[in-house]
Amino acid sequence: MKTLRRISRNRAFTYVRILAAVLLVLTAAALVFLAVSPPAVAQPTAHRQPLTPKFSKAVAFDVSPALRSLPLGKKHVADPSKLLEIRPEGGPRARSRGYKSGDGALQLLKPAAPTIPAPLLTFEGLSNEDNFNIFGFRVNPPDPNGEVGPNHFVEMINLVFAVYDKAGNLLAGPIDTGSLWTDFAIPDCTDPSGDPVVLYDQFMDRWLLSQFTTSGLNDPTKPFWNCVAISTSGDPTGTYYRYAFETTSDGIFYFPDYPKYGNWTDSYVITTREFGPTIEYGIGVYALEKNKMVNGDPNARSVKFFIDGNDPDLLPLVGDGLLPADPDGKQKPKTDTAIPIIGTQDDDASYGATFDALNIWDLFIKWRSTPIASLGLNTQLHTASFDSIFPCTPTSRDCLPQPGIVNTAQYLDILSYRQRPTFRLAYRNFKSYESLVTNQSVEATPGVTHS
């Protein structure tokens, strides 16, 4: 398996130069603020060979009916006690080595009064009751995901989605996610499979809705796909260009778990946590050819990099996931800049990291007639100390108490049972500098009840 190297500084593109400060808060979240600065020096690794890009085309394409015309989901025979678990597990599992380094940015004081203004509007969105009403069961985890455009709010959860206007009026839905791909050439996309993501592309005035496929988990002869729908206009209730991109690498059918999406100037970027049928594990990084997709070109291309998680020199650098940058605001990233992708590493986890850090990767892609692409580790930024692996028992995830809640089945998902930052990685270009903001769950003090 090919491995990584740092991209040389004489490449004909501009780097995003980043200085990071990590703000860890008492609610078990860490806000990571990154501003432009001269680059930190990457720690040396044993590998200097480049990761190999794999280019391919969409395996299927068509245009959907108008979303507003899709029928609402039909209610099936309900079982109030049934809870569908969507938690495919694979790959290594980060284990805590105890509360060692602590929270180096723990805040001991809080403002005397709230400093955030009251919301302008509050309305009910989707819930697990919508799953119950459509499928006859509830789903865990719900994986809520939403995006705001100029005139709409689109929300997706496992396994339904809906469109609202800015006043909170329901315009379409709730609809089961698979209905968006009804009669598509890849039948697996028509199943409501889970892990949906919705993005609004403010540069193109388009909506992106997605999900993965899961039928290959029960049939090792079947591959997996990222199912991606791009609205044909700025109206999220209209028609969509539908695409399917296969995730197979080196003949291995990789399941693209935990997909996270980002928007850039000429690419849509996906990062996934991938595992194969036996011990195969790694992080998938994809770029999709944006200009062809928004114009409904069936020959839209993709490129994939696979970072091998079974390589002990690479595992500390990627842990359980990377996040692609996703811009906020109207100012585009600078022309020909690499796309920043961020991961975290924790020296108190069991993946071999020797210090706490943010790992900054650069993804570069040119969609020429013969495309070129590269992915490499730009730098590692040391952070204040943190522990990201909670001592969660008896479950692996749902163990964070809530005020007034005594039923342990209603405790919160800690979101840090693995070593990874959490969606999104918000990018903003302020013209004079650029910034990136994301989150990392941490154990603020020993024990879950104090996190």
Provide a role label for each language-model segment:
Residues 1-16:
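N-terminal secretory signal peptides that target proteins for export/translocation
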Residues 32-46:
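Signal peptide processing junction and immediate N-terminal pro/mature segment
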Residues 6, 21, 111-114:
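Short amphipathic alpha-helical "recognition" segments used for binding
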Residues 19-35:
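Bacterial N-terminal signal peptides
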Residues 42-451:
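C-terminal PAP-associated
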